[in-house]
Amino acid sequence: MRSANEISGLVLKAARGAGMALGCAEELAHAAPSLARDGVFDMIVDLLEGPFEPPVLKEGALIGGHPVLAIAAWIDLRAAGRDPTLEHSVSPFLINAMRSEAFPVGPHDVSEQTWERLLAYAERTFVPETDASRLAGAGAGLTDND
């Protein structure tokens, strides 16, 4: 069982580690607890496979692109008073989770296999520890008196 904050925090780091732009990674992280609540959290790992291409708006339709980017563009265009169609095969769970203002608190069941795969993506954002970085002031040093 994982809290909503644990889920969103890890999904944000994993999406950034996968190469997703910060704003889209934040959108996916916000949607993640809803996906966990709905029992479809495992889809997030598939969503971290690139490329993270934007959709194309052509004749009132959003065509192609990565599902997260396509849904985000669709939501933004609708908020701006336009009514585009979404020409992309995406999960209705993902659309609803990204549109939702609610943030389900949890706890939520998340498979360990999915959690480990997300951790692997998140680890790509870590900076390697070196003696030079420690000498330059990185880390807590020898004492941590916060």
Language-model features: where?
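Glycine-rich, aromatic-bearing surface loops/beta-hairpins
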Residues: 82-146
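A glycine-rich, acidic short-motif signal
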Residues: 40-103
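Conserved active-site and cofactor/substrate-binding residues in soluble primary-metabolism enzymes
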Residues: 2, 6, 10, 20-27, ...
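Long alpha-helical, hydrophobic tracts
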Residues: 1-54
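Residue-identity detector for glycine
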Residues: 9, 17-19, 23, 39, ...
